[in-house]
Design a protein with these regions (language model features):
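Short gly/ser-rich loop at a beta-strand->alpha-helix junction or flexible surface loop bordering the NTP-binding
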Residues: 1-253, 388
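Surface segments flanking catalytic/ligand-binding clefts of nucleic-acid enzymes
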Residues: 29-32, 37, 43-44, 52, ...
Length: 388
């Protein structure tokens, strides 16, 4: 029996209150919340109906709909994502990302269209269905892990499929689920609430039914690492406690497996990559007697400040006592203005006696190099005088 309904109702009120107060809520750019708790899904490619495109193409070519030239023109300009919808080829995911998916998919399929785009197409073709699983996570503002997953819909009909990449998996739930309503350019689509999406995604990550690339971490199975990444993102976006996760996943995830994943969870991690670094380096850090915390606020003089005080920077990971500062630098840190700001902050921290390490996604993939860098950092930090 699904146990997260009460938390989902609380989240709806929390989100609505935050939107009324500030005009926004803490989600990814793909989703905004209206004051009533309705999602407005905006910033990903819209699936295009094939029938009007085919008619328009035939008119432009001045041929009948059945002509092979119409099909050839469609194939040149569009990629089909479902039985009745397509996207322009310019809206397809990068080739390197699409090519990486078959190795992880149980049937070796690839999905050139993103999960949210496919979800909208399948929802339009299946009136009354509710988007669930990884596609629901994407619509709820957590798209990072979803693109290579099959679209899943809750439906009153029997469970089946998919038989090919253009079909969704239809699931008949044992118990009814109260859906949230999303809107994309005025069209409504039903989506499962956050806690139900979390539970189903964690279950599939732990079972290995859906997977994505993660580095090998000694002592941790890839399935558990992925489950921790998913939990961290939901906790960060929807501000969930460990107790919320336990309650919300009741009936969907085995208690013992969930407890093991929660023990490794960091609710302050801003991305899946930020989840990985502590998992990789934790044995080294603990071996040197150093405890690292996430999201540490520092003032202009490099000393810690409270949540309501002005701050110069927020450490992604660090130790006040051992004067360690760690940052995760994503692609946005390559911008000139951001690089200048990062350099200024690094110089200020070094002047304040802190040791600074900036970690990129490429460094996380090379676990051996990351371990060596953290070992050197910890050895230096442990041998220095501690902060008073």
């Amino acid at each position: 029996m699904y146990g997260g309904a009460e938390i989902d109702r609380r989240l709806r009120w929390t989100i609505a209150a935050e939107v009324r107060r500030t005009g926004r809520f803490n989600t990814e750019s793909a989703v905004a919340f209206a004051a009533g708790g309705v999602l407005r899904v905006e910033s990903f490619p819209e699936p295009i109906g094939l029938s009007p495109v085919r008619r328009h193409t035939a008119e432009l070519l001045r041929v009948s709909l059945s002509e092979d030239t119409v099909t050839a023109e469609l194939l040149a300009r569009y990629h089909r994502v479902s039985r009745e919808h397509a996207i322009t080829r310019g809206d397809m995911k990068p080739d390197w990302l699409v090519d990486s998916e078959p190795a992880r998919h149980p049937r070796g399929w690839r999905y050139p269209a993103g999960a949210a785009t496919r979800a909208l197409a399948h929802a339009r073709e299946n009136p009354g269905a509710v988007v669930t699983g990884w596609a629901a996570a994407a619509l709820l503002g957590i798209p990072e892990f979803s693109d290579g997953a099959d679209t899943q819909l809750l439906t009153r009909s029997r469970s089946r499929g998919p038989d090919d990449p253009q079909e969704p998996r239809l699931i008949r739930p044992r118990n009814p689920v109260e859906a949230w309503q999303a809107r994309h350019r005025g069209l409504a689509v039903a989506v499962v609430p956050p806690m139900y999406a979390l539970g189903t995604c964690v279950r599939e990550a732990l079972s290995g039914r859906h997977a994505w690339d993660v580095p090998a971490i000694p002592g941790l199975a890839g399935e558990r690492v992925r489950a921790v990444q998913v939990i961290d993102r939901f906790r960060r976006v929807f501000v969930l406690s460990a107790a919320d996760v336990r309650e919300g996943c009741a009936g969907l995830v085995h208690n013992r497996e969930l407890a093991k994943a929660l023990k490794l969870s960091d609710p302050s991690a801003d991305s899946g990559w930020e989840t990985l670094t502590p998992l990789i380096v934790d044995p080294i850090v603990r071996g040197h007697g150093i405890a690292l915390r996430s999201q540490i606020r520092l003032g202009e003089d490099g000393s810690p400040v409270g949540p309501d005080e002005p701050c110069m920077t927020v450490l992604d990971l660090g130790s006040v006592e051992f004067r360690v500062a760690v940052y995760y630098d994503g692609g946005n840190h390559l911008e000139r203005r951001r690089r200048d700001r990062d350099a200024k902050i690094t110089a200020s921290l070094l002047a304040a006696g802190r040791m600074v390490l900036r970690v990129s996604a490429g460094m996380v993939r090379d676990t051996g190099d990351l371990v060596r860098r953290f070992t050197a950092l910890c050895e230096s930090a442990a041998g220095r005088p501690r902060a008073g």
